């Protein structure tokens, strides 16, 4: 959520910056609502003051032995008017809040202006794509040939966009998650967390999935002791970031760096017909998530560091990649600045996203009321939140199968993963 004061005082600037994201803010309507809010606020305060003043005169009139029926009637009339104005004011505030909750974050000035992914800007590459002297297979053919990827059984059990993994490929998938967690906790300073895969509405509102992106989620029917429905997490960003919702942490505790390896669930409502084969776009997938909670002045440096942590995974695995900065029209709803890391996939002969690292600044923190106590004045201030994939496990598995394939259909295991595979050097 944007700063309400900035929104009121810099409405034209806000509209201009949001327009670079493709979000058209109805300035005239919002201005009208703000004027109505001010008018109702003044009217409410005046009615309240009048009623209070007249109410005090009742006791004085009684002490003088005067009839107070007329005064009582006047107080009752003012009370009815006050209640009516409060209802009007609440309706206006609710509409203003709904508009505010629908607004995406303001893009950072360093984010390139553009309409879509074609205007993202590549900032660096690492590694050289391998040259093959045999016909390249994609991960589907490789995985099925090794009896490790079973799409048919997944369709029978559940439906499309799910997978059953078996044997050494299932083991390799597990090894990847463990390797990523170990790297981030032992070398990058993150604390591992085990979090729920089901979250409540308040959590999804806090990180910005609701109210706008409800159709992208899987929802349960009310089934808890509290009688509320829950939603499967689309990313561990949701539970990890919400750990500080409605909290004030000490400045000395910052930065807070958290990581979790979880299953993630997405309906892919807007992706009909895209990546219908294989592991690239699944309803259920594993991901190691990185979250940082920092002071505002540290968040841009933290974004660079977090992106580097995700890149290190690919470097240790020897997987070529490129990093791009997203233009304003391609950024996620809550992001102020985002780097996408794209890994090289020989089976598709292109780079594909494997991590998205974002600085949300105070956008999520304001929705969650996640704050820290500033030592200098002992007052609470909003945190800045950051998140990124470190990495998407399934897509990393795809990259390993395709980049490390051999002519006979076997797959060489990257050296960094061999300790997690019992010393195994090859699958198949």
Swiss-Prot record:
Pfam families: Seryl_tRNA_N, tRNA-synt_2b. It catalyses: tRNA(Ser) + L-serine + ATP = L-seryl-tRNA(Ser) + AMP + diphosphate + H(+); tRNA(Sec) + L-serine + ATP = L-seryl-tRNA(Sec) + AMP + diphosphate + H(+). L-serine binds at residues 235-237, 289, 389. Pathway: Aminoacyl-tRNA biosynthesis; selenocysteinyl-tRNA(Sec) biosynthesis; L-seryl-tRNA(Sec) from L-serine and tRNA(Sec): step 1/1. Keywords: Aminoacyl-tRNA synthetase, ATP-binding, Cytoplasm, Ligase, Nucleotide-binding, Protein biosynthesis. ATP binds at residues 266-268, 353-356. InterPro entries: aa-tRNA-synt_IIb, aa-tRNA-synth_II, aa-tRNA-synth_II/BPL/LPL, Ser-tRNA-ligase_type_1, Ser-tRNA-synth_1_N, SerRS_1_N_sf, SerRS_core, tRNA-bd_arm. GO terms for molecular function: ATP binding; serine-tRNA ligase activity. GO terms for biological process: selenocysteine biosynthetic process; seryl-tRNA aminoacylation. Its main location: cytoplasm. It is found in: Cytoplasm. Its EC number is 6.1.1.11. Gene3D superfamilies: Bira Bifunctional Protein, Domain 2, Serine-tRNA synthetase, tRNA binding domain. GO terms for cellular component: cytoplasm. CDD domains: SerRS_core. It is an enzyme of class 6 (ligase). PANTHER family: SERINE--TRNA LIGASE, SERYL-TRNA SYNTHETASE. Homodimer. The tRNA molecule binds across the dimer. Belongs to the class-II aminoacyl-tRNA synthetase family. Type-1 seryl-tRNA synthetase subfamily. Catalyzes the attachment of serine to tRNA(Ser). Is also able to aminoacylate tRNA(Sec) with serine, to form the misacylated tRNA L-seryl-tRNA(Sec), which will be further converted into selenocysteinyl-tRNA(Sec). NCBIfam families: serS. Consists of two distinct domains, a catalytic core and a N-terminal extension that is involved in tRNA binding. This is Serine--tRNA ligase. It comes from Shewanella sp. (strain ANA-3).
């Amino acid at each position: 959520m944007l700063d309400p004061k900035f929104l009121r005082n810099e409405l034209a600037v806000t509209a201009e910056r949001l327009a670079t994201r493709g979000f058209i803010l109805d300035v005239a309507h919002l201005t009208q609502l703000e004027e109505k809010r001010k008018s109702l606020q003044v009217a409410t305060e005046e009615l309240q003051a009048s009623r209070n003043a007249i109410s005090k005169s009742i006791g004085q009139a009684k002490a003088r032995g005067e009839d107070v029926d007329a005064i009582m009637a006047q107080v009752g009339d003012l009370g009815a008017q006050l209640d009516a104005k409060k209802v009007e004011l609440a309706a206006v505030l609710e509409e203003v809040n709904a508009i505010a909750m629908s607004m995406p974050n303001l893009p950072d000035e360093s984010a390139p202006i553009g309409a879509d992914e074609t205007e993202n800007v590549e900032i660096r590459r690492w590694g050289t794509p391998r040259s093959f002297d045999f016909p390249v297979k994609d991960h589907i053919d490789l995985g099925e040939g090794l009896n490790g990827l079973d799409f048919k059984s997944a369709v029978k059990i559940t439906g499309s966009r799910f997978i059953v993994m078996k044997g050494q490929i299932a083991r390799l998938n597990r090894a990847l998650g463990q390797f990523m967690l170990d790297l981030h906790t032992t070398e990058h300073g993150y604390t591992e967390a085990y979090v729920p895969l089901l979250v409540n509405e308040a959590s999804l509102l806090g990180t910005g999935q609701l109210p706008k992106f409800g159709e992208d989620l899987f929802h349960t029917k009310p089934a808890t002791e509290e009688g509320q429905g829950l939603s499967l997490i689309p990313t561990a960003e949701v539970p990890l970031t919400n750990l500080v919702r409605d909290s004030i942490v000490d400045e000395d505790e910052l930065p807070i760096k958290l990581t979790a390896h979880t299953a993630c669930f997405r309906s892919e409502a807007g992706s009909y017909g895209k990546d219908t084969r294989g592991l690239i776009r699944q309803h259920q997938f594993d991901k190691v998530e990185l979250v940082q909670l920092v002071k505002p002045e540290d968040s841009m440096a933290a974004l660079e560091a977090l992106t580097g942590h995700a890149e290190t995974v690919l470097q240790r695995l020897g997987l070529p990649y490129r990093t791009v900065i997203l233009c304003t029209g391609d950024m996620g709803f809550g992001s102020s600045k985002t780097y996408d890391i794209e890994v090289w996939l020989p089976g598709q002969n292109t780079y594909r996203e494997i991590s998205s690292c974002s600085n949300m600044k105070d956008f999520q923190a304001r929705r969650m009321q996640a704050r820290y106590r500033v030592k200098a004045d002992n007052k609470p201030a909003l945190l800045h939140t950051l998140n990124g994939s470190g990495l998407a496990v399934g897509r990393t598995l795809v990259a390993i199968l395709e980049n490390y394939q051999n002519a006979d259909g076997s797959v060489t295991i990257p050296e960094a993963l061999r300790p997690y595979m019992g010393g195994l050097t090859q699958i198949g």
